[in-house]
């Protein structure tokens, strides 16, 4: 018991002394996760439409992209974006008044590309879960295909899609810790900074784990409210 109390005391001391480190890490983690899911949702929706397209080349292209992204490690994708693109002559954007913008851009692009593949399957599954009879009924009433999709299918599919998108956001937050390898000051990166200064690793990692848990718990708690709306 005494050892546990001492451990918790060291954790609290570390947290109060280096709370600005952890706060910056949380901020950057949420920024990366938010934009990754936002862009992933936008392009994932487009990819889902291509995946269900009647035009075979587009459908095959979307299927190949989704299978490739889901079948390769996120680390490889991140390294290719950050290190590989500049080697091919494609420079990442950089803004002088935003520190490390190119690193953030690489992290968000890689995370968005990865999320896009999973979101595409979430949306496709949500749409296909709607009974096909709904589509046939709408078409028999004279609805165009676009009207059928926007006015009949999507409103019903959203109920299937939103919970899965919430889970995707949770997954992106957890996977975003990988961007620390390219120098983005997310929560994991800042935790490593604290370890480098204090040489106290276990307590610091425990703090990081608790902070991740709190962030994800808040998202889970907010989901029922969002779905009711």
Question: Where are the regions that the model predicts?
Answer:
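Transmembrane alpha-helices and adjacent helix-loop boundaries
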Residues: 1-222, 226
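Conserved protein kinase catalytic core
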Residues: 229
């Amino acid at each position: 018991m005494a050892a546990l109390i001492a451990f918790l005391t060291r954790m609290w001391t570390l947290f109060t002394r280096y709370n600005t480190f952890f706060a910056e890490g949380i901020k950057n983690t949420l920024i990366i996760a938010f934009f990754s899911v936002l862009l992933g949702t936008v392009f994932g929706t487009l990819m889902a439409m291509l995946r269900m397209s009647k035009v075979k080349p587009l459908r095959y292209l979307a299927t190949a992209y989704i299978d490739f992204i889901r079948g390769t490690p996120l680390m490889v994708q991140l390294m290719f974006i950050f290190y590989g693109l500049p080697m091919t002559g494609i420079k990442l954007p950089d803004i002088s008044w935003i520190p490390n913008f190119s690193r953030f851009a690489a992290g968000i692009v890689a995370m968005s590309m990865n999320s896009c593949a999973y979101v595409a399957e979430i949306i496709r599954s949500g749409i296909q879960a709607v009974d096909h009879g709904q589509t046939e009924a709408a078409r028999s009433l004279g609805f165009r295909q676009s009207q059928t999709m926007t006015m009949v299918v999507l409103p019903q599919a959203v109920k299937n899609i939103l919970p899965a998108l919430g889970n995707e956001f949770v997954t992106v937050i957890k996977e975003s810790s990988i961007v620390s390898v390219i120098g983005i000051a997310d929560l994991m990166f800042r935790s490593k900074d604290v370890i480098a200064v204090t040489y106290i690793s276990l307590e610091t990692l425990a703090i990081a784990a608790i902070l991740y848990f709190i962030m994800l718990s808040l998202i889970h708690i907010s989901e029922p409210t969002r779905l009711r709306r």
